[in-house]
Amino acid sequence: MNKFDRLCEQLFKVNIPFSQNDGIISIQPDNANINIHMSIYVGVSYYGWYKRINNKIESGVDENFQNLLVRIMNFYVDYENTS
């Protein structure tokens, strides 16, 4: 299983609604009270990825959701380092 599929699997396990197309995962959380659309580009560095997410998250997003994204990013970094 490649890292993109692994990441999709993690999102599925924690019940985050997402769609994927051409190596880009789009997340639109149902539990956020605002209109938010994030694209996570798989394969860029940890810092680039984190910055990308921070640039796209608007104020008011559920704090638990942000923490969840950080956990997912950490999973991805760990996977990168061991593959």
Regions picked out by a protein language model, each given a short descriptive name:
Residues 1-31, 50-66, 82-83:
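Negatively charged, low-complexity tracts enriched in Asp/Glu with abundant Ser/Thr
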Residues 75-83:
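Metal-dependent nuclease catalytic core centered on acidic motifs
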Residues 13-15, 42-45, 74:
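Glycine-centered secondary-structure boundary/capping sites
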Residues 32-37:
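Short, charged/polar, Gly/Pro-enriched secondary-structure boundary elements
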Residues 40-54:
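Short aromatic-glycine-(Arg/Gly/Cys) micro-motifs in beta-strand/loop hairpins
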Residues 64-76:
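A short, charged, amphipathic alpha-helix used as a generic interaction element across diverse proteins
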